Amino acid sequence: MPGKSTRPLPAPRPCCAPCPFWSPRLAGMQGTGSTRSTGSESWRSWAWTSRPSLLVTGRLHFPQLALRRRLGQLSCMSKPALKLRSWPLTVLYYLLPLGALRPLSRVGWRPVSRVALYKSVPTRLLSRAWGRLNQVELPHWLRRPVYSLYIWTFGVNMKEAAVEDLHHYRNLSEFFRRKLKPQARPVCGLHSVISPSDGKILNFGQVKNCEVEQVKGVTYSLESFLGPRTPSEDLPFPPATPHSSFRSQLVTREGNELYHCVIYLAPGDYHCFHSPTDWTVSHRRHFPGSLMSVNPGMARWIKELFCHNERVVLTGDWKHGFFSLTAVGATNVGSIRIYFDRDLHTNSPRYSKGSYNDFSFVTHANKEGIPMRKGEHLGEFNLGSTIVLIFEAPKDFNFRLQAGQKIRFGEALGSL
């Protein structure tokens, strides 16, 4: 502007302590002709250029010089020493801007995958803590605000509840396990298999190549999910041969096929599950395991997620042969309850990875097992989770479903 002289700003001088509002550049790039040094020495030859302060940009800039000096020191470490710092470095890798940890690639460091990082989270411990929190009795004046927030967040329809008064539920656990009005979920009597719970259909169809789809394009092994066949299951299995597949060991009648259906229960859904058909439960197998989230996004991300998580497999038979219902645990769903199984205890503090516990309902006094009628109460979760049905049926069995559709307990899954 006229009348005003412009004076060049003096070049900033480096100081001893790194300043969070200045960023470094390599001094060697200004044409001094010197060769680039290696290791931590290359991070000490930095010039300073100005960067807008926090007041101008509204963003906080970290002391990058000190950070990069530290990364230079790490890049000179041996692989064993660097391996001890792998987990905290991986966390920084996913939080810092792209390329910030690039110097560590000189010694062969690679970040831990997101899946492995997520599996390292103590989900079982968090779920046990959540379970204890659910049992804490809320003051009478606090119940309506807490439950109303949950209802608004997850879209719960309290008009279907047998007791609509929010002050009736003493703690979160009672609220999650609320009963429905009898007319809220009529059971379809025209179809042979109904939905055991409210939820979302993730996948369904025939079991092919001994694999089951948890979501579209992501499969898991049928044998890993149900566990190996054992004589203690008291099921009418055909005799196994060395070359027989696991699927053929489950199909008891010639000409039948094996089918599956996966139902995801969201946190706002009705948390109890019921018998999907008339059948007899003869065996229970409990797999202790992780308690990772089972929402559809996570199911697409982690292969064989249902095989990693804790689950309770109920097996038996119905009029067409083999039938099984599996309740899969998830984060904050450490408690899976089966009403007629008092010996079942889930989310124990200690367990052996890959182990399972068998229990037979066939005894000398009861040689048939536990008979279940279609629609009868079977069990419950503390929060949302997943139900997996695997059953044998004739080839003309047809599902009346679409992938991704919402379904409610009592509605038809399929029929002959």
Swiss-Prot record:
Q: After translation, how is this protein modified?
A: Is synthesized initially as an inactive proenzyme. Formation of the active enzyme involves a self-maturation process in which the active site pyruvoyl group is generated from an internal serine residue via an autocatalytic post-translational modification. Two non-identical subunits are generated from the proenzyme in this reaction, and the pyruvate is formed at the N-terminus of the alpha chain, which is derived from the carboxyl end of the proenzyme.
Q: Which residues carry this modification: Pyruvic acid (Ser)?
A: S385
Mitochondrial intermembrane topological domain residue ranges: 87-416
Task: Tell me the enzyme class.
Answer: lyase
What pathway annotation does it carry?
A: Phospholipid metabolism; phosphatidylethanolamine biosynthesis
Mitochondrial matrix membrane side: 1-67
Any single Gene Ontology cellular-component annotation: lipid droplet
- Note describing how the cofactor binds: Binds 1 pyruvoyl group covalently per subunit.
Q: Which reaction does it catalyse?
A: a 1,2-diacyl-sn-glycero-3-phospho-L-serine + H(+) = a 1,2-diacyl-sn-glycero-3-phosphoethanolamine + CO2
Q: Which UniProt keywords apply?
A: Cytoplasm, Decarboxylase, Lipid biosynthesis, Lipid droplet, Lipid metabolism, Lyase, Membrane, Mitochondrion, Mitochondrion inner membrane, Phospholipid biosynthesis, Phospholipid metabolism, Pyruvate, Transmembrane, Transmembrane helix, Zymogen
Q: Record's family?
A: Belongs to the phosphatidylserine decarboxylase family. PSD-B subfamily. Eukaryotic type I sub-subfamily.
Please identify the protein, giving its name as recorded.
Answer: Phosphatidylserine decarboxylase proenzyme, mitochondrial
Recorded source organism is Bos taurus (Bovine)
Q: Which gene encodes it?
A: PISD
